[in-house]
């Protein structure tokens, strides 16, 4: 895989010099440039991720754990996803924003998938949705694609089915399971997915699946043989310490830095060194004297301070 012509250098078409990446750009990246994808859950994080040059932003249902403090992703609602997706879209100019369809918003049938997918796509402004699994949800994938809603697939460890899988375990370690994963990947490609996430899959298996697909794969715990990589932003920045998956590389310790900053702020507030003169606003001497004279005229005295 070469390193020329990244999607992020696509010819700008907007008046401000950038344009949003499309599914066509993502497809064209296969075999040309690895794709960088990260999660974002609000306007500020989207601005950071987009401004740093990520190709795709995933508004994942992982927000249930990372942002809302829940134990898993299963309780995240469509309304919650819409709330976060809108904020992310507002903070993004170039990266392609993809939204997870929450648990039980598509598994119950084609009609539900279309109604919920259309609402998520139309009301939030995301440019694609992501569904987990294959088999039973293939009709939903086809229906969404036929309706004009781009779909990203997700195979391997699928967090919405973690209970069924017996926990967070690597998938595809047996030959039969690896072949089943490959067949599912082909089925999702044929159903119209423009790309595919492979999560917690042995690296050699993910590499071979990637080499036999026409659509790009994006790995998370699936080795360097995928066409791109995705991580949870809060994991790679050291902001979320409840879980520490093996596949996460921590690029910063922002939780530590933030904790030190907050502690320093609290200390300065308590000792009276913040705010300093440069952080405050003054008043004309004459106006202040007039203000004090008015207070004295009213007989307003200072309240005694505590011991």
UniProtKB/Swiss-Prot annotation:
Its EC number is 2.1.2.11. GO terms for biological process: pantothenate biosynthetic process. Its cofactor is Mg(2+). GO terms for cellular component: cytoplasm. SUPFAM superfamilies: Phosphoenolpyruvate/pyruvate domain. CDD domains: KPHMT-like (cd06557). It is found in: Cytoplasm. Its main location: cytoplasm. 3-methyl-2-oxobutanoate binds at residues 61-62, 100, 130. Catalyzes the reversible reaction in which hydroxymethyl group from 5,10-methylenetetrahydrofolate is transferred onto alpha-ketoisovalerate to form ketopantoate. Homodecamer; pentamer of dimers. This is 3-methyl-2-oxobutanoate hydroxymethyltransferase. The gene is panB.
């Amino acid at each position: 895989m070469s390193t020329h012509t990244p999607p992020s250098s696509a010819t700008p078409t907007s008046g401000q010099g950038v344009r949003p990446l499309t599914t066509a750009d993502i497809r064209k990246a296969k075999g040309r440039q690895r794709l960088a994808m990260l999660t974002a859950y609000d306007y500020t994080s989207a601005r950071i991720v987009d401004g740093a040059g990520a190709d795709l932003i995933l508004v994942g249902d992982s927000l249930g754990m990372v942002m809302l403090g829940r134990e898993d992703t299963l309780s995240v609602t469509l309304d919650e996803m819409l709330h976060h997706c809108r904020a992310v879209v507002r903070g993004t100019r170039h990266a392609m924003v993809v939204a997870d369809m929450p648990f039980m918003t598509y598994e119950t049938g084609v009609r539900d998938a279309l109604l919920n997918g259309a609402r998520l796509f139309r009301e939030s402004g995301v440019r694609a949705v992501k569904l987990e699994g294959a088999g039973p949800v293939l009709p939903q994938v086809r229906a969404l694609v036929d309706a004009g809603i781009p779909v990203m697939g997700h195979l391997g460890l699928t967090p919405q089915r973690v209970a069924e899988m017996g926990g967070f375990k690597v998938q595809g370690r047996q030959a039969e399971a690896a072949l089943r994963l490959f067949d599912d990947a082909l089925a999702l490609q044929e159903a119209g997915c423009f790309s595919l996430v492979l999560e917690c899959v042995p690296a050699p298996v993910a590499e071979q699946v990637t080499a036999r697909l026409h659509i790009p794969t994006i790995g998370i715990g699936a080795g360097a043989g995928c066409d791109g990589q995705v991580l949870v932003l809060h994991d790679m920045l050291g902001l979320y310490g409840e879980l520490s998956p093996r596949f996460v590389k921590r690029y910063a310790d922002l939780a530590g830095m933030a904790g030190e900053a907050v502690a320093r702020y609290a200390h300065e507030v308590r000792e009276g060194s913040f705010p300093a003169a440069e952080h405050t606003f003054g008043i004309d001497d004459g106006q202040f004297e007039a203000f004090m004279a008015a207070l004295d005229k009213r007989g307003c005295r200072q309240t005694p301070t505590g011991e």
